[in-house]
């Protein structure tokens, strides 16, 4: 709405037209909205262990007690295991609204596992947001497929090669 005001169900608002369009896309996403993480849950599934670079961010640690973020995982999952885990969590956490693939390697480089996971989750929970985190090197090869899967949140990490 030109010159208008957009607001969320939890009281935040924006006034700029461009910001309003962006806000509409991120307001319910717990990774991108300061307030959304109080109302919506997200889950990362570690289905993509292969990577095309070795950076300091995704060091592919397992069971690191002090870290809980994309790139660090307790266990690698197959796409089928990830789907079962997502369905189990969704049955107990109704606020679950976002599923992301962010490693522990690169989600675009390990594409077959990432795509199979997204396809399974989207088939079972069609209204869930799908997200991906990638170093971007293999992203151009999969942009059309990501769009076809309605993956509308892509995080591109900017890291330094060791």
From Swiss-Prot:
Q: Please tell me which top-level EC class this enzyme sits in.
A: lyase
What does the entry's cofactor note say about binding and number?
Binds 3 [4Fe-4S] clusters per monomer. One cluster is coordinated with 3 cysteines and an exchangeable S-adenosyl-L-methionine. The two others probably act as substrate.
The residues covered by the Radical SAM core domain are 37-162
Recorded hits in PROSITE patterns, A to Z, give: MOAA_NIFB_PQQE, RADICAL_SAM
- What is any Pfam family matched here? Radical_SAM
Q: Which cofactor does it need?
A: [4Fe-4S] cluster
The entry's protein name is FeMo cofactor biosynthesis protein NifB
Q: What Gene Ontology terms for biological process does this UniProt record contain?
A: nitrogen fixation
Q: In which pathway does it act?
A: Cofactor biosynthesis; Fe-Mo cofactor biosynthesis
Q: What is its EC number?
A: 4.-.-.-
The protein's matches in CDD domains, at most eight in alphabetical order, are given as:
Radical_SAM
Residues binding S-adenosyl-L-methionine are 57, 105, 157
PANTHER family assigned to the protein according to its UniProt record, in alphabetical order: FEMO COFACTOR BIOSYNTHESIS PROTEIN NIFB (PTHR43787:SF13), FEMO COFACTOR BIOSYNTHESIS PROTEIN NIFB-RELATED (PTHR43787)
Report the sequence similarity comment from the record: Belongs to the radical SAM superfamily. NifB family.
Q: InterPro entries per the record?
A: Aldolase_TIM, MoaA_NifB_PqqE_Fe-S-bd_CS, rSAM
Amino acids binding [4Fe-4S] cluster = 51, 55, 58
- In the UniProt record, does the keyword Metal-binding occur? yes
UniProt keywords, alphabetically: 4Fe-4S, Iron, Iron-sulfur, Lyase, Metal-binding, Nitrogen fixation, Plasmid, S-adenosyl-L-methionine
Q: Give one GO term, molecular function aspect.
A: 4 iron, 4 sulfur cluster binding
- Originating organism: Rhizobium leguminosarum
The record describes the protein's role as:
Involved in the biosynthesis of the iron-molybdenum cofactor (FeMo-co or M-cluster) found in the dinitrogenase enzyme of the nitrogenase complex in nitrogen-fixing microorganisms. NifB catalyzes the crucial step of radical SAM-dependent carbide insertion that occurs concomitant with the insertion of a 9th sulfur and the rearrangement/coupling of two [4Fe-4S] clusters into a [8Fe-9S-C] cluster, the precursor to the M-cluster.
């Amino acid at each position: 709405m030109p010159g208008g005001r957009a607001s969320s169900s939890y009281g935040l608002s924006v006034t700029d037209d461009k910001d309003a369009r962006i806000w509409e896309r991120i307001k319910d996403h717990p990774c991108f909205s300061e307030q959304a993480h109080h109302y919506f849950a997200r889950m990362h599934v570690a289905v993509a262990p292969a990577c095309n670079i070795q950076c300091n961010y995704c060091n592919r640690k397992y069971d690191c007690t002090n870290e809980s973020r994309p790139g660090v995982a307790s266990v690698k999952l197959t796409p089928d295991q990830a789907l079962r885990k997502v369905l189990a969590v969704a049955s107990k956490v109704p606020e679950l609204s976002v599923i992301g693939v962010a490693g522990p390697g690169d989600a675009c480089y390990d594409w077959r596992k990432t795509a199979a996971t997204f396809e399974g989750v989207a088939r079972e929970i069609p209204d869930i947001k799908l997200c991906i985190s990638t170093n971007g090197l293999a992203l151009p090869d999969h942009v059309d497929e990501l769009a076809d899967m309605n993956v509308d949140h892509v995080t591109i990490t900017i890291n330094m090669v060791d």
